[in-house]
C-alpha cells in the first residue's frame, strides 16, 4: 500500500548490534565527579537546559521548530514559577541575536555560536557539538562553582553536550529523548530518510550516562528499555502539558471561523504542523480525495486548511503538497497557510471540525492536546503517544495504519453528523484539563530531586 511504513523485525538482533550496544554502554559510563560540597536541597535552584538544534524563540511549525520548542518554553516558565531558575542554551542562527534574552522572569535564553548562522542542516550539527560545548563551558566559566545544580538536555544532540557538561560540573544529568532513532526507523514514511547509525550509537551512550531519563508516555519508557537497554528505575514518565489559558474553547467555533474568514457550516478537517513525511499530511489530502470521490456533493461545503511550514525531505515542501492536491483534483478545497503564532493557532483549532494527525510516529503529539483543549476532536494514527493524548471514541478517533480510505470514513461520519464534532469537542476540552503544564513542571521537579539524590549516592559510593 502506498505510504505504508516499512516494519523490520524489531526482535532480531545481529552480532553487529550486540557489539554496538556493548560499545555504547562502555562509553556511556560516566566517571564520578570529584567530591564537592553538596547542598541538601529538595530541588535544584538553577538548571542548565540544553536545546542545540532548535531555539525556544523560533516559530513552531516551520523548519525544525515544533512541539519540542513549545515543551521547553512552557516547562521552563512553569519551573521558574516554582522557584527553579532555568537557563536555556541554544545555537545562534543569526548574528543579530543578542547573546542572552530573558524569556520571562527566571528563564534566560543563551545563544551559542556554533557553525554558520544560516544554511546548516540538522544533519550537519553533530560536527558542531564541540563548538557548542565550548560555548556552554565559556558561559559556565563566568560563574562561581556550583552555579548550575543540574543539566537537563533535550534530543540526542543536546544529550552529548549535557553528558560532558554534567561530568565537568559534577552535576546530575536528566535527559529527554523526544524522538528515538530506532523507533523512527521502524516506522518510516515513504520518501523519508532513515536515521544514521551514528545517532543510534549516540542515543545509547546518553541513555547509559544519564542519571534520569524522562519519557512522555509509558510506551516511550518501554521503548527506552527495549531498544536502548535503559535501566527501568532511571526512567520517569512525565506527560507534557498544554497551556490551558491559551488553548480553550473561548468564544467558540463560530467566532473563530468569522475571524479566519471560514464558512460557518463547512466541514473543516485541519492539518497543523511541520510539513514533512513523518507527519503525513499527504494522507489527509488523499483521504479528502477519497471522500469527494464517494460524496462529490460535499465539495461545495468543504475546506481543508494546511497550516505549517517545510521541513525534512520528499513531500516536505509546500509545493510538493500543492502539486499532489492538483493531481488529486482537490486543489480548490485545500488552503495552505504559513506557520502562525500560538494565539492564532488556537483560533485555527477552535474553527476546525476535526484536527487530523496521520503521523507515522509521535512521541506524544502536543498539538493533539492543544486542539482538544480548544474544544476540537482529533482524528489520528494510533502511534506513539497519541493513544494517551486522544481518548479513542470519546475525544476523537484513532486509526490503525495510514490507509487514506480509513481516514475518509471518519471524515464522512463528521460530515453526516454535524453535531458529532461539537459533542466530542466538549469531551475533548474536559480531557485536556488533565494535562496542565503546572502538573508537568511539578513532576519534572520530582525527577530532578531523584536525579540529585542518585548522583550524591554515586559520588559517596565512589569516594567512600
Curated annotation (Swiss-Prot):
It catalyses: 1D-myo-inositol 3-phosphate + UDP-N-acetyl-alpha-D-glucosamine = 1D-myo-inositol 2-acetamido-2-deoxy-alpha-D-glucopyranoside 3-phosphate + UDP + H(+). CDD domains: GT4_sucrose_synthase (cd03800). GO terms for biological process: mycothiol biosynthetic process. GO terms for molecular function: acetylglucosaminyltransferase activity; D-inositol-3-phosphate glycosyltransferase activity; magnesium ion binding. Residues 1-44 are annotated as: Disordered. Its EC number is 2.4.1.250. UDP-N-acetyl-alpha-D-glucosamine binds at residues 59-60, 67, 274, 279, 340, 362, 370. Keywords: Glycosyltransferase, Magnesium, Metal-binding, Transferase. 1D-myo-inositol 3-phosphate binds at residues 53, 64-69, 122, 155, 179, 199. The keyword Metal-binding applies. Gene3D superfamilies: Glycogen Phosphorylase B. Catalyzes the transfer of a N-acetyl-glucosamine moiety to 1D-myo-inositol 3-phosphate to produce 1D-myo-inositol 2-acetamido-2-deoxy-glucopyranoside 3-phosphate in the mycothiol biosynthesis pathway. Belongs to the glycosyltransferase group 1 family. MshA subfamily. Homodimer. This is D-inositol 3-phosphate glycosyltransferase. It comes from Streptomyces avermitilis (strain ATCC 31267 / DSM 46492 / JCM 5070 / NBRC 14893 / NCIMB 12804 / NRRL 8165 / MA-4680).
